[in-house]
Regions:
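Metal-dependent amide/peptide-bond hydrolase catalytic core
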Residues: 22-39, 56, 242-425
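A non-catalytic alpha/beta surface segment that caps or lines the substrate-entry region
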Residues: 53-106
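Bacterial N-terminal signal peptides
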Residues: 8-16
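Acidic/histidine-rich catalytic neighborhood of metal-dependent amide-processing enzymes
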Residues: 132, 137-216, 258, 277
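Bacterial N-terminal signal peptides that target proteins for export
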Residues: 1-9
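N-terminal hydrophobic or amphipathic helices/low-complexity stretches enriched
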Residues: 20-64, 212-217
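Acidic-glycine-rich active-site phosphate/pyrophosphate-binding loop
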Residues: 115-128, 200, 212-224
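Catalytic-core environment of secreted peptidases
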Residues: 98-143
């Protein structure tokens, strides 16, 4: 009886999912055939040269981690120039602008992050070679910011009336050390925190066929090993924090983790010491732990801390502690929640239907993006590409291809997805 019941439920779920997929496609088809939406898509084509100019202008205002303010001011001004009303920069540094709908639909937020991974002083000038734009951050995420601007202009030019309000956002703190601080403020303290019903992050160049519906969780540590230190010759035989850290790294490298759900670890940066002929007082490392599963991430973090302490204990047993012992301190410097927006949820089905409409087959993936935060809070969220193509993200020779056909198609795909979520009058 239980087996039959389970099979019945399973069949119902499959049938319901298939029915919803068909319904989502009909929604997207209807929106795509709307005369105002067709006019908006034609405007995007005519607006493309301006998009390229704006990509360059945005990119050439540096936005290192925690220093996005100048780019935020520029983007806020660009939003105002589209005619968007009530543009503001919130206390965390996010740029916000609301496009009002009829009030009968959900509030949909669409965001592109302002910050880059590149430190202050990086040459962020853009070089153009034919259809290629080259410059650090040009694809991640200057293009996406320019795409939001083009979508606003297109909707206004074509007089597209959405049922739901659309909140356009240029947010801070998406990249590494930022630890999603812009999203944390938006969803935990910002004035729209209880109103956002769906969230779309536009991040990176690409055709738009991939839908990031999984949030890759991470926990990052700054680990410090301390000891008494001393002269390399005169104090030889004392405990050495470098040896303890080396043992810790070796122990970390031997921790077994599952391939599904994918779980990883990495020692990314090491430092410490004062001179070649000194036993250091202090050495440190920065460690990145990641998993698609909250449970696996927690399990890995517990094992990691255990091995750090064990490595310090081993060094204290191996050498003299008459001047002091090795101690270890692991401080969390970043934490991103994990989770998933189900493939059969309305937001994913509508995004997939839009992908189909533009001649692609949707794929689904897991990533560490602005969507992590809303997903963890139960807000339906996805991350999509901004169109075109590109490569070498996070490298000084980062590039995007702004060939018009693929670039415009990608912008219109993002816009269609957005309109499917907000609804069109």
């Amino acid at each position: 009886m239980k087996i039959a019941s389970s099979l019945t439920i399973a069949c119902w779920i499959v049938t319901a999912a298939a029915a919803w997929a068909q319904d989502a496609q009909s929604v997207v088809d209807r929106i795509s055939n709307h005369s105002a939406v067709r006019n908006a898509q034609q405007f995007v084509d005519s607006d493309h040269d301006r998009v390229i100019r704006e990509i360059i202008a945005i990119n050439e205002v540096a936005a290192p981690p925690f220093k996005e303010s100048e780019r935020a001011k520029l983007f806020a001004q660009m939003l105002r120039e589209t005619g968007l009303q009530g543009v503001e920069i919130d206390p965390e540094g996010n740029v916000l602008g609301l496009r009002k709908g009829t009030g009968s639909g959900p509030l949909v937020a669409i965001a592109a992050h302002l910050d880059t991974v590149f430190p202050e002083g990086t040459d962020v000038r853009v070089k153009r070679e034919g259809n290629r734009l080259l410059g650090p951050g040009v694809g991640d995420n200057s293009r996406s910011l320019a795409v939001l601007l083009s979508i606003i202009r297109a909707l206004d030019e074509a007089k597209v009336q959405t049922t739901g309000d659309i909140l356009f956002i240029g947010d801070v703190g998406e990249e590494g050390p930022g630890d999603l601080r812009g999203m944390r403020y938006l969803f935990q303290k910002g004035r729209y925190k209880d109103r956002i019903r769906m969230f779309v992050s536009v991040d990176g160049a690409g055709s738009g066929s991939d839908i990031v519906n999984g949030a890759l969780g991470s926990r990052r540590y700054h680990v410090v090993f301390r000891g008494p230190g001393g002269h390399s010759y005169g104090a030889f035989g004392l405990v050495n924090p470098t040896y303890a850290m080396a043992k810790a790294i070796d122990r970390l490298s031997k921790i077994s983790v599952p391939s599904t759900p994918r779980t990883t670890y990495n020692v990314g940066v090491v430092g410490g010491g004062t001179s070649v002929n000194s036993i250091p007082n202090e050495v440190w490392m920065d460690v990145d732990l990641r998993s698609e599963s909250p449970q696996q991430l927690h399990k890995l973090a517990e094992e990691f801390i255990k091995q750090m302490n064990s490595a310090a204990d081993d060094e204290n047993r191996a050498r003299s502690t008459n001047q002091g012992k090795i101690s270890v301190e692991a401080k969390v410097i970043g934490e991103r929640p994990s989770g998933i927006t189900a493939v059969d949820s309305p937001i994913v089905k509508l995004a997939a239907a839009a992908v189909n409409k533009f001649g692609f087959s949707p794929t689904y993936s897991v990533g560490s993006t602005d969507s992590n935060l809303p997903i963890s809070l139960g807000v339906p969220a996805i991350t999509v590409d901004s169109g075109g193509s590109g490569g070498r993200a996070h490298a000084l020779d980062e590039w995007i291809n702004v060939e018009k056909t693929n670039s415009v198609r990608g912008i219109n795909l993002v816009m269609t997805t957005l309109l499917a979520l907000s609804g069109v009058q």
